[in-house]
């Protein structure tokens, strides 16, 4: 039993260092993209879609920037990097919220999008597959993309369904 415990502990540390190196690489890529202006251009590309998903958020409000950055980080499979951006986005959305005790429409939509987790490049899963010597660590990309696209579409549809249901009842 002791041998298994120490072997598992060693493997956990090795796996964590492997995942950290992948995270550091992608965070570095995000910084390069930020300094080169690529993030700003991508943000402009996504803003029309994001503005439609969050119509109550003014286009130049800081919340919009955090929302777009969070979605982009999640899309690249950088969940750990997306978390602080998501927290900042929620803080900004709370400032915009007139009723502080209840989540706003934008807060609910943002939560639904984050929960669905649209991912183009599942970096963490690829890293784990590399660690365990997978013959093709990237073969997970296609199924992950399909599953997360379906989940994101479902999240948006369900979010809109309940929003319009509340509007018809006069709750919002």
Language-model features: locations:
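Membrane-embedded alpha-helical segments and adjacent helix-loop junctions characteristic
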Residues: 2-92
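Alpha-helical transmembrane segments and their lipid-water interface positions
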Residues: 17-22, 121-123, 155-159
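Membrane-interfacial segments
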Residues: 33, 37, 41, 97, ...
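Hydrophobic alpha-helical transmembrane segments
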Residues: 67, 111, 141-145
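Mid-bilayer segments of alpha-helical transmembrane spans in multi-pass integral membrane proteins
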Residues: 71, 75-80, 114-123, 148, ...
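Hydrophobic transmembrane alpha-helices that form the pore/transport pathway of multi-pass ion
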Residues: 71-113, 128-134
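Juxtamembrane and boundary regions of transmembrane helices in multi-pass small-molecule transporters
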Residues: 100, 140-172
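Membrane-embedded transport cores of multi-pass solute transporters
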Residues: 120-140
């Amino acid at each position: 039993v002791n041998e298994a415990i120490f072997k598992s502990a060693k493997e956990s540390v090795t796996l964590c260092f492997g995942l950290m190196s992948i995270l550091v690489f992608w965070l570095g890529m995000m910084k390069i993209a930020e300094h080169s202006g690529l993030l700003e251009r991508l943000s402009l590309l996504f803003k029309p879609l994001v503005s439609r998903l969050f119509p109550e958020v003014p286009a130049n409000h800081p919340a919009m920037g955090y929302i777009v950055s969070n979605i982009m980080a999640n899309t690249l499979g950088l969940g750990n990097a997306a978390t602080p951006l998501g927290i900042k986005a929620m803080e900004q959305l709370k400032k915009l919220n007139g009723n502080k005790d209840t989540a706003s429409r934008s807060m609910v939509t943002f939560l639904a999008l984050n929960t669905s987790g649209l991912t183009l490049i599942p970096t963490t899963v690829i890293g784990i597959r590399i660690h365990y010597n997978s013959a093709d660590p990237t073969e997970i990309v296609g199924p992950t993309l399909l599953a997360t696209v379906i989940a994101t579409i479902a999240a948006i549809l369900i979010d809109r369904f309940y929003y319009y249901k509340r509007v018809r009842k006069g709750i919002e």
